[in-house]
UniProtKB/Swiss-Prot annotation:
Organism of this sequence: Schizosaccharomyces pombe (Fission yeast)
Biological process annotations from GO: meiotic drive
Protein name in the entry: Meiotic driver wtf35
Membrane-crossing residue ranges in chain numbering: 105-125, 142-162, 184-204, 218-238
Self-association state and partner proteins as the record states: Homomer. Forms protein aggregates. The two isoforms can interact with each other and with themselves. High sequence similarity is required for their interaction.
Pfam families documented for this protein: WTF (PF03303)
Bias kind Basic and acidic residues: ranges: 1-29
One cellular-component annotation, GO: ascus epiplasm
Function: Promotes unequal transmission of alleles from the parental zygote to progeny spores by acting as poison/antidote system where the poison and antidote proteins are produced from the same locus; the poison component is trans-acting and targets all spores within an ascus whereas the antidote component is spore-specific, leading to poisoning of all progeny that do not inherit the allele.
């Protein structure tokens, strides 16, 4: 076996540059690596200790907080190699994957039940005022009560099932209504005039119907009239004069259309009279 002798001109610095490592002057140069058995390691190498090996790798690549990429996040989903890579999205901390925006049970029940109370309050107050609350009821009266209870149940069911929808709609309507508060006095005056003009036919109908049917007709026309008054008040507050303006526009539109047709029929001039040279 031949001995390998290094020439005298080769210095320790040149060996360090050649091997790309720093040589410990006390321990000497690194021994040669035997590729056949692969077991030869430097006697003073830190790789003999696995813990130090991990620390050296960390120091080598400088894995610390200062060199962490800004877009890296432990909560991001891993990128797969199948097909198109999905975008980096944060994981949601919801068990069902959807947010629950529903209102609390008690508030939902209270508001839905309040709508039924407001629906039944006028009828109950009127019956108590007439001292006819569950007194001397016949088949027709009990049929009407049953129909009223069924209507209340249907209203409560819809109020409960579509709670989120109708509460948002009512909230937006109230906000829009409050923006038009300057129109409220005029709308109230128009509703008052509406009650005066329609009040006399209601009184006549109650007298014509008689005592037996007077209660039902009076109750029905009171409810219908109250609803109409509320609708007129809302419409005239949000858009004053909208109903009257629409009627006037239609009348003006019909008159203008008739006048236009009349002008076209009697004042149209033939083209040959306008251009007599065209005949020649």
């Amino acid at each position: 076996m031949k001995n390998k002798d290094y020439p005298l001109r080769t210095s320790m610095d040149e060996l360090s540059t050649k091997n790309d490592n720093e040589i410990d002057l006390e321990k000497g140069p690194l021994p040669e690596y035997n590729s056949e058995d692969g077991s030869t390691l430097p006697p003073y190498s830190d790789l003999n200790n696995p813990k130090q090996m991990g620390q050296n790798i960390t120091k080598l690549f400088n894995w610390n907080k200062s060199t962490t990429p800004p877009d890296y996040d432990e909560n991001r989903l891993p990128i797969t190699d199948e097909g198109n890579n999905p975008p980096n999205t944060h994981r949601e901390n919801h068990s069902s994957g959807t947010t629950d925006n529903s209102s609390p049970f008690l508030i939902k029940l209270l508001i839905s039940f309040t709508s039924i109370i407001l629906f039944n309050a006028p009828a109950v107050c009127y019956l108590k005022y007439k001292d006819a609350f569950f007194k001397n009821y016949g088949a027709a009266e009990w049929t009407l009560i049953g129909f009223w209870c069924a209507s209340s149940l249907i209203i409560f069911t819809f109020s409960w099932y579509f709670y989120e929808t109708w509460t948002k709609a009512v909230g937006k309507g109230i906000k829009h209504f409050l923006k038009k508060w300057r129109n409220i006095p005029m709308a109230f005056s128009e509703v008052f005039l509406f009650n005066i003009l329609v009040g006399s036919p209601r009184v006549a109908l109650r007298h014509i119907s008689g005592e037996r049917w007077g209660l039902k007709c009076s109750l029905a026309d009171h409810i219908i009239f109250a609803i109409l008054s509320i609708l007129v008040f809302i419409v005239e507050t949000v858009e004053p004069g909208s109903s009257k303006i629409n009627i006037m526009k239609r009348l003006r539109g019909d008159n203008a259309r008739d006048a236009t047709q009349h002008v076209n029929e009697y004042t149209a001039v033939p083209l040959r009279e306008m251009n007599p040279e065209s005949e020649a």
